[in-house]
């Protein structure tokens, strides 16, 4: 099966090309922290020769608790994103939750993200598609990989074929997630070769049924990321934080920023090895 390539300037995102790191922080906590985190990612990815897209949310609209930090909002968030682009020359991905956000966000960032909880909301999907921007679709935790083809079709019916699919884990009973690596290939097939990326940090979430925030399994981020890249995919979606224990959102799943270079170095080695192998047709 031929793999589709998404081109963003000099970036080429595809399942059969060197992996792209979609990395940053969960939510914009401040302008200064965003600058520091982005600078570290740029330093590491430039040193290791890894294609890079900065990620962060300006509004976490689906927090568990009404009291949880959501972010600076769209207006302030877009100002920060523009400064990051001007300063570091990075491509940026962020999520939208409302139809009115689609056009102004797509005018600043390079990839707009359809959140997992909203991935079947047709009006939102259509509004995003009509911007013409590249769209990253998060697979809902409650949806099988095969059903992602229907979401891709909605986007393509609006005249937009610039689609990336992202796995962020699947419900395993109550308050737990697992990752089905076989689903990566299924998503490639039902989308006719769309790039598939793996959100390793969100896949490590654990829900506290009586708490106001998610827990996580940060200690397992390296082994899960290794397994995901071993399948042969287009990219890795990763959140890192200078002080994960005091992060305003999903700290228990975030990689300590100080370990970023060692982590990305391992991931590049695995991706290079896997993609050096010839494909073996075992379907006959």
UniProtKB/Swiss-Prot annotation:
The lineage of its organism: Bacteria, Pseudomonadati, Pseudomonadota, Gammaproteobacteria, Pasteurellales. It is found in: Cytoplasm. Keywords: Cytoplasm, Lipopolysaccharide biosynthesis, Transferase. This is 2-dehydro-3-deoxyphosphooctonate aldolase. It comes from the Bacteria. GO terms for cellular component: cytoplasm. HAMAP family: KDO8P_synth. GO terms for biological process: keto-3-deoxy-D-manno-octulosonic acid biosynthetic process. Pfam families: DAHP_synth_1. Belongs to the KdsA family. Its EC number is 2.5.1.55. It catalyses: D-arabinose 5-phosphate + phosphoenolpyruvate + H2O = 3-deoxy-alpha-D-manno-2-octulosonate-8-phosphate + phosphate. The keyword Cytoplasm applies. GO terms for molecular function: 3-deoxy-8-phosphooctulonate synthase activity. Pathway: Carbohydrate biosynthesis; 3-deoxy-D-manno-octulosonate biosynthesis; 3-deoxy-D-manno-octulosonate from D-ribulose 5-phosphate: step 2/3; Bacterial outer membrane biogenesis; lipopolysaccharide biosynthesis.
């Amino acid at each position: 099966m031929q793999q589709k390539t998404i081109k963003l300037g000099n970036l080429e995102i595809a399942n059969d090309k060197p992996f792209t790191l979609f990395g940053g922080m969960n939510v914009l906590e401040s302008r200064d922290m965003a600058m520091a985190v982005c600078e570290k990612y740029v330093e590491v990815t430039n040193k290791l020769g890894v294609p890079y897209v900065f990620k962060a949310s300006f509004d976490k609209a689906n927090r568990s608790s009404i009291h949880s930090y959501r972010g600076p909002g769209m207006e302030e968030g877009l100002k920060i994103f523009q400064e990051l682009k001007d300063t570091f020359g990075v491509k940026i991905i962020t999520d939208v939750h409302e139809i009115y956000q689609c056009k102004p966000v797509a005018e600043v960032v390079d990839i707009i993200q359809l959140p997992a909880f909203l991935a079947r909301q047709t009006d939102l999907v259509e509004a995003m598609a009509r911007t013409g921007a590249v769209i990253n679709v998060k697979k809902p935790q409650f949806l099988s990989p095969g059903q992602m083809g229907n979401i891709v079709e909605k986007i393509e019916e609006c005249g937009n074929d610039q689609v990336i699919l992202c796995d962020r884990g699947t419900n395993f009973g109550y308050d737990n997630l697992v990752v089905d690596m076989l689903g990566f290939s299924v998503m490639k097939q039902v989308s006719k070769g769309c790039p598939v990326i793996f959100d390793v940090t969100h896949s490590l979430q654990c829900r506290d049924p009586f708490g106001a925030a998610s827990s996580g399994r940060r200690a397992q981020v390296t082994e899960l990321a290794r397994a995901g890249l071993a399948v042969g995919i287009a990219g890795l979606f990763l959140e890192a934080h200078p002080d994960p224990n005091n992060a305003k959102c999903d700290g228990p799943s975030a990689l300590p920023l100080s370990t970023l270079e060692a982590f990305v170095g391992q991931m590049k080695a695995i991706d290079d090895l896997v993609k050096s192998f010839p494909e073996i047709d075992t379907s006959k």
